[in-house]
Curated annotation (Swiss-Prot):
Its EC number is 2.4.1.-. Coiled coil: none annotated. UDP-glycosyltransferase which uses UDP-galactose and malvidin as substrates to catalyze the biosynthesis of malvidin 3-O-galactoside, an anthocyanin conferring purple pigmentation. Gene3D superfamilies: Glycogen Phosphorylase B. Highly expressed in leaves, sheaths, pistils and embryos, observed in stems, stem nodes and panicles, and present at low levels in roots. One of its GO terms (biological process) is anthocyanin-containing compound biosynthetic process. This is Malvidin galactosylase UGT88C3. One of its GO terms (molecular function) is UDP-glycosyltransferase activity. CDD domains: GT1_Gtf-like. Pathway: Pigment biosynthesis; anthocyanin biosynthesis.
């Protein structure tokens, strides 16, 4: 008889696909050969995403793992009339629900569980119809999960726009949250993206469990609040499995190190500020000029800045950066004036290799959770510059809850604009040896490095949570659908 399989349904984003594949492989190892993994592949909506996913699938298939297989779902029509990328993705996934149902029902082997992405709550309805336990893989923080679960209650309790509230918002397990730190989906309650956010919080209550890419020691108070039902007004929440950090580390290249890494080799320890705004991070010319001015005036601090160019196609879902034309983007003479202490890199850079380098002492990041986990893993303190989605809430978590970041003042109403003087102040605060604020952030970052690594060791909290998840899936048994 064929092994029971865990069906995994990821979306195509860089911070979603590979962590779910890594989690699937860990399930295989934890089951001791009792389970297999079947990955359902939705067609990516952009050519660049399709190329990335195809390359990742090819690498996995070439690795020779017998117990992980990939199945392609048929294409669906792209939605129109949406008000945000979250709603757009969610509507694509709802269109795929019949395809997911057919793919699972057509499997020859018994099905032990369905693990869906954060956006895939329609798939939980499919799992319920088929009698299969449904889990959500949550690639964000437990703090963000607490906010999501709390959102239906907030929706009923707060009558005005959240930004019009007097005082902070109370999320159990967290310090008081200023409305300015809320995700972009919560800032306009008249938009359908807000309705999607609240509906997602309700939908998660139908899950058998939620698998979170965090370590228990990083967010103990939040995880306790979720487990106690304080985020869901006394109603028991699904079991939460904090199994992170789940990070993918590709093998080192056989050729010589990347040029950015070679440049770092020549710099003193903990002396370089690394600036990178994610795979989709785009900075308009005014922001580029402010960053350049701040770096010039930052007291001689070294920097490595990944600066990307504008996309060829700016339609929804097509915001893919291009290689930057530095002479066109940067102020005249900037590269010459900072020669020797700064490197501006105009295309993709190996972020993990850079953060792992001993020369890196600080990280200006867009606050995507994957990038945050990488900085925590390598013990690099942060200057948070959120751009979109839940990133402002992540920035709040880094500063107020985890303590690994120096706050950076910005004008969210001006597209998250940061003045050069404010960035200069924050850079000096993070990087100067004499800065008390920087010392505290560096010390906390070093602590989180040790916490993250201990958590994933055998017997650590994340390893234990993952084994508990695996045991729970095996214990529940599998359903022969076909």
């Amino acid at each position: 008889m064929a092994k029971p399989t865990v069906v995994v349904l990821p979306v195509w984003g860089a911070g979603h696909f590979m962590p779910m594949i890594e989690a699937g492989k860990r399930l295989l190892r934890g089951s001791g050969g009792a389970l297999s993994v079947t990955v359902l592949l939705m067609p990516a909506p952009t050519p660049d995403a399709a190329v990335d996913i195809a390359a990742q699938v090819k690498r996995e298939e070439a690795s020779g793992a017998d117990d992980i297989s990939f199945r392609h779902l048929p294409a669906v029509d792209m939605p129109t009339g949406h008000t945000g990328v979250e709603e757009w993705i969610s509507r694509i996934l709802r269109s795929h629900a019949p395809n997911v149902w057919a793919a699972i029902a057509g499997l020859d082997c018994p099905v032990a569980a369905l693990v869906t992405d954060i956006f895939c709550t329609p798939a939980l309805e499919v799992s319920r119809e088929l009698g299969v336990p449904g889990y959500v893989y949550f690639p964000c923080s437990a703090s963000m999960l607490a906010l999501l679960l709390r959102s239906p209650g907030l929706d009923e309790e707060v009558a005005v726009e959240f930004e019009e509230m007097d005082g902070a918002i109370r999320i159990p397990g967290l310090p008081p949250v200023p409305p300015s730190a809320l995700p972009s989906t919560m800032l306009d309650r008249k938009k359908s993206t807000y309705d999607w956010f609240v509906a997602t919080g309700r939908g998660y209550m139908n899950a058998t469990g939620v698998i979170v890419n965090t370590a228990a020691e990083l967010e103990q108070s939040v995880l306790a609040a979720i487990a106690d039902g304080r985020c869901t007004r006394g109603v028991p929440a699904p079991t939460v499995y904090p199994i992170g950090p789940v990070l993918s580390f590709p093998p080192p290249p056989e050729e010589q190190p990347h040029e950015c890494v070679r440049w770092l080799d020549a710099q003193p320890p903990a002396s370089v500020l690394f600036l990178c705004f994610g795979s989709k991070g785009l900075l308009p010319p005014p922001k580029v000029r402010e960053i350049a001015a701040a770096l010039e005036r930052s007291g001689g601090h070294r920097f490595l800045w990944v600066l990307r160019g504008p996309p060829k196609d700016s339609r929804q879902g097509q915001r893919v950066p291009t290689d930057a034309m530095l002479d066109e983007l940067l102020p005249e003479g900037f590269l010459e004036r900072t020669k020797g202490r700064g490197l501006v890199w105009p295309t993709r850079a190996p972020q993990k290799e850079i953060l792992a380098h001993a020369a890196v002492g600080g990280f200006v990041t867009h606050c995507g959770w994957n990038s945050i986990l990488e900085s925590l893993w390598f013990g690099v303190p942060v200057l948070p510059w959120p751009l979109d989605a839940e990133q402002h809430f992540n920035a709040f978590t880094l500063v107020a809850h985890l303590g690994v970041a120096v706050p950076l003042g910005m004008d969210r109403r001006r597209d998250n604009f940061v003045e050069a003087a404010e960035l200069e102040r924050a850079v000096r605060s993070l990087m100067d040896d004499a800065s008390d604020e920087g010392r505290k952030a560096r010390a906390k970052a070093a602590e989180t490095r040790a916490v993250c690594r201990k958590a994933v060791e055998e017997g650590g909290s994340s390893s234990t949570a993952f084994q508990r998840l695996t045991d729970d899936i095996v214990r529940r048994g599998a359903v022969q659908i076909r």
